[in-house]
C-alpha cells in the first residue's frame, strides 16, 4: 500500500477483516483495487484512539497502523 500522501508524523490506519485479512475501505467495503484504503491521522495517539474505538464496536475488524514510510507501527484487535 502506498502512503506517500502522508506527511512526516502522520499515521495511516488500515482496517481489514480479521478472519480473512482482506483490506477494507474506510466505509467498511472490501477494498479490491482501491487507491486509498486507509484513514490518515496527525498523530499516533489519534490513530490509536480511532482504531481502538473501531475494533471495540466491530470485533471482526483489525487495524494496522503505519507511518509515512510504510513502516508497520502496531496492530490493534478487539480484546473481546
Short names for language-model regions:
Residues 30-33, 38-62:
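A short, charged, amphipathic alpha-helix used as a generic interaction element across diverse proteins
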Residues 56-80:
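Short, mixed-charge low-complexity intrinsically disordered segments
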Amino acid at each position: 500500500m502506498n502512503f506517500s500522501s502522508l506527511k512526516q508524523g502522520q499515521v495511516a490506519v488500515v482496517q481489514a477483516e480479521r478472519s480473512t485479512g482482506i483490506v477494507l475501505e474506510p466505509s467498511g467495503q472490501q477494498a479490491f483495487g482501491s487507491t486509498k484504503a486507509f484513514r490518515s491521522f496527525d498523530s499516533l495517539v489519534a490513530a490509536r484512539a480511532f482504531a481502538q474505538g473501531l475494533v471495540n464496536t466491530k470485533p471482526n475488524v483489525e487495524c494496522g497502523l503505519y507511518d509515512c514510510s510504510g513502516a508497520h507501527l502496531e496492530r490493534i484487535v478487539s480484546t473481546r
